[in-house]
């Protein structure tokens, strides 16, 4: 397997994962639950400084680990330049997503954009159609409304974002 191909392979918590790997995510989950209990912080943004540091892998595994404890978890892919979540989880590129729900065309279709992974215990809101202005789209009222709607349904919202060095 080539280096480039190997880079995009997802290593997930579960029965096949090494004990230490799974325990590290359980420890992270416990720490976040303690923090959430005192601050009511239920939206967790995952980022990195540069591409290739594993932020999408962390986002997926954190979402699964939180769901394993009985929490309702939605994983939102906001990496609109280079979506890795959809590739990891084999969500078709043409599936509607957050961009479609906030740009006006399919705003009422949030429920249709969500992809339920019952085997993993999580729901994913993929990117959708890649917009010409991704960073501007993240700061809209429609985005705020979408997150408000998700907060009504889910215990945790895990947000996968682009690396800090990529966003302009």
Regions found by a protein language model. Give the residues of each.
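P-loop NTP-binding module
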Residues: 1-168
